[in-house]
Design a protein with these regions (language model features):
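Extended acidic/polar regulatory tracts at the flanks of large eukaryotic scaffold/adaptor proteins
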Residues: 2-299
Length: 299
């Protein structure tokens, strides 16, 4: 799917991970043969694109399904490989899982209390009231991970360590950061067709033209060949980092809408659904993860 017509272009060799929420991404004005070219959106083109996908979604399924795009087998298998590694249940008895939980604890406390390290001791901190400050629904965060699994914990850690400014803005207030993040992790995995766990989202994602196109576009972005600037050890690691970047943009979109709203927890699910619909339309218009960030956050 082509992006909307450009007004200006920015060349990205990598994502500047400190610029989320408050600052514009760093730009590189020299041309790099392996850089991602990011076009700043034409507002009218973006508006028209949204309208066209909204109209397509109202055409009956028995007509539109003939026009649905599909993800080729090689790319889907690459997504399955990613899912097999990271989309697994969180287990309290697994040392590596508990260690990751500890990383989230330490990152949060380092940001909020400005200390180099707040050591995580599983016996003391695996169940602790401080988890509720991060937006978990109970003092035992493992209960929240039943739906999103280990991936949802990994993505919360990614946000806290790569976008500390975003974390400090979202955590500790009236925004249920952890609960929202876990929901977004579940949504992305379900959108990609990789959700093997039974949860309420499975019944809420009927195929629409926008949703199917977003799935194919996201799957393509995640499995495109790595750039020279992406020095992760494997294609799975590259795909995971890209998925984490999309996750962070989803969270920023949701937080932005929450800030505009009356902040009524009773309408939070409605806000979630509206954010998902907007994000999926933008995914349809974005040829890369970097372009998705620009479309979503520079409007």
């Amino acid at each position: 799917m082509n992006s909307t017509p450009p007004e200006t272009s920015t060349h990205y060799n990598n994502v500047n991970e400190e610029n989320f929420v408050t600052d514009a991404p760093a730009t590189h004005h020299h041309h790099h043969p392996h850089a991602v070219v990011v076009h700043h959106p034409n507002p009218w083109g973006l508006y028209l694109g949204r309208c066209l996908y909204a109209i397509a979604d109202h055409i009956p399924y028995f007509i539109m399904y003939r026009f649905f795009p599909s993800l080729d087998e090689e790319r889907f298998n690459a997504l399955l490989s990613l899912s097999n590694q990271y989309n697994v249940p969180y287990k309290k008895e697994e040392a590596a899982h508990v260690q990751l939980l500890g990383s989230l604890w330490e990152a949060h406390h380092r940001l909020f209390f400005h200390q180099d390290k707040i050591p995580f001791v599983a016996a003391q901190h695996a169940v602790h009231v401080d988890w509720k400050e991060m937006g978990f629904q109970a003092s035992d965060p493992s209960t929240d991970f039943r739906g999103g699994g280990l991936l949802s914990l990994q993505q919360l850690c990614y946000l806290a360590t790569h976008y500390p400014t975003a974390w400090t803005k979202m955590a500790g207030g009236d925004f249920l950061l952890a609960a929202a993040g876990i929901n977004i992790s579940m949504r992305l995995i379900t959108l990609l067709g990789l959700n093997t766990r039974k949860n309420v989202l499975n019944a809420q994602l009927p195929p629409t033209y926008t949703r199917v196109t977003a799935r194919v576009q996201l799957g393509t972005c995640l499995t495109d060949p790595p750039l020279e600037s992406e020095n992760e050890n494997s294609k799975d690691a590259v795909a995971l980092r890209r998925l984490n970047e999309v996750y962070c943009v989803y969270l920023e979109l949701l937080f932005r809408e929450w800030q505009k709203s009356d902040k009524n927890i009773l309408t939070f699910n409605t806000l979630l659904m509206e954010t998902y619909e907007e994000a999926e339309r933008l995914l349809c218009l974005a040829p890369s993860v970097e372009q998705f960030r620009v479309l979503a956050l520079e409007q």
